[in-house]
From Swiss-Prot:
Domain of life: Bacteria
Protein name: Photosystem II D2 protein
First-listed, main subcellular location of the protein, grouped into a coarse class: membrane
Keywords of the record: Chlorophyll, Chromophore, Electron transport, Iron, Magnesium, Membrane, Metal-binding, Oxidoreductase, Photosynthesis, Photosystem II, Thylakoid, Transmembrane, Transmembrane helix, Transport
Position of the signal peptide: none
Gene from which this protein is expressed: psbD1
Length: 351
């Protein structure tokens, strides 16, 4: 009798590393974690550092940190100075030359947070792809998360790249984002942009679908428990349905005359509406980066200029936008030393 003794297959460093990264642990790392974890850590750390200690006096002429008296709503990591253009503002670059304090004064933390934040979001999407592949499910979670990534990249990176500098991107703060929204309206008439309209329809439509779906499921739960709390009657591993699709279909058929009869189509629609809203609004922001206009009703503006008694909601909004530009620009861009004489400031037809 012959006994054959096999040799154990050789395992290279890549196989060992792959096994370690994909090991079942409390916090899954994976290959995507090599991108996600360090970039997210640095982006969050940079934001906390900036909002706590770093002033915006040298970039925007304002206070923006807790150290200067701001609160959670008014603190921000502000965009770099307009003179920095589209520099990456590396700490060791020609602007800061390795001086950390100087780097913070110039707005280097904003570039640091924006770039690391973008890579962290991409890493999180790759994490969903990786785990979906390991679990054996389809990657629609990752596809859905491409919506927030598109918005972040278009607003914080693509828009300022189309403008003269990073200065015109939104700063990382609550009130700073609100200021950016007013800026978009005043300088781009953003609310009348069709891509903004599609974005609003997608986001609010997604919220409506979410509310309707949740309420309908709660309405049609099977009475399969004896306790008053229906949540305790559900088991994650149960084979039977927990609510009645047939009853839900009958209910909405009576309400609207039509209803979803296919759960798969229903849930795809709930995925499609908000994600398309995010994608379309991102496309619109890229249009704004290129200073593209949308829905300029010039005929109404000409008639309003000729006839003091003619005014529409559109012409009123145009006047409001002119006011935003005239009053906002001197405060928003103090380095330009804008001075608008009283006679050129916008006035409504009633004046």
């Amino acid at each position: 009798m012959t006994i054959a003794v096999g040799r154990a297959p050789q395992r290279g460093w890549f196989d060992v590393l792959d096994d370690w990264l994909k090991r079942d642990r409390f916090v899954f790392i994976g290959w995507s974690g090599l991108l996600l974890l360090p970039t997210a850590y640095m982006a969050i750390g940079g934001w906390l550092t900036g909002t706590t200690f770093v002033t915006s006096w040298y970039t925007h002429g304002i206070a923006s940190s807790y150290l200067e008296g701001c609160n959670f709503l008014t603190a921000a990591v502000s965009t770099p100075a307009d003179a920095m253009g589209h520099s990456l503002l590396l700490l060791w670059g020609p602007e800061a030359q390795g001086d950390f304090v100087r780097w913070c004064q110039l707005g280097g933390l904003w570039a640091f947070v924006a770039l690391h934040g973008a890579f962290a979001l991409i890493g999180f999407m790759l994490r969903q792809f990786e785990i979906a592949r390991l679990v054996g499910i389809r990657p629609y979670n990752a596809i859905a998360f491409s919506g927030p990534i598109a918005v972040f990249v278009s607003v914080f990176l693509m828009y300022p790249l189309g403008q003269s500098s990073w200065f015109f991107a939104p700063s990382f703060g609550v009130a700073a984002i609100f200021r950016f929204l007013l800026f978009l309206q005043g300088f781009h008439n953003w609310t009348l942009n069709p891509f903004h309209m599609m974005g609003v329809a997608g986001i609010l439509g997604g919220a409506l679908l979410c509310a309707i779906h949740g309420a309908t499921v709660e309405n049609t739960l099977f009475e399969d428990g004896e306790q008053a709390n229906t949540f305790k009657a559900f088991e994650p591993t149960q084979e039977e349905e927990t609510y009645s699709m047939v009853t839900a279909n009958r209910f909405w058929s009576q309400i609207f005359g039509i209803a979803f009869s296919n759960k798969r189509w229903l849930h795809f629609f709930m995925l499609f509406v908000p994600v398309m809203g995010l994608w379309t609004s991102s496309i619109g922001i890229i249009g704004l980066a290129l200073n593209l206009r949308a829905y300029d009703f010039v005929s109404q503006e000409i008639r309003a200029a000729e006839d003091p008694e003619f005014e529409t909601f559109y012409t009123k909004n145009i006047l409001l936008n002119e006011g935003l530009r005239a009053w906002m620009a001197p405060a928003d861009q103090p380095h330009e030393n804008f001075v608008f004489p009283e006679e050129v400031l916008p006035r409504g037809n009633a004046l």
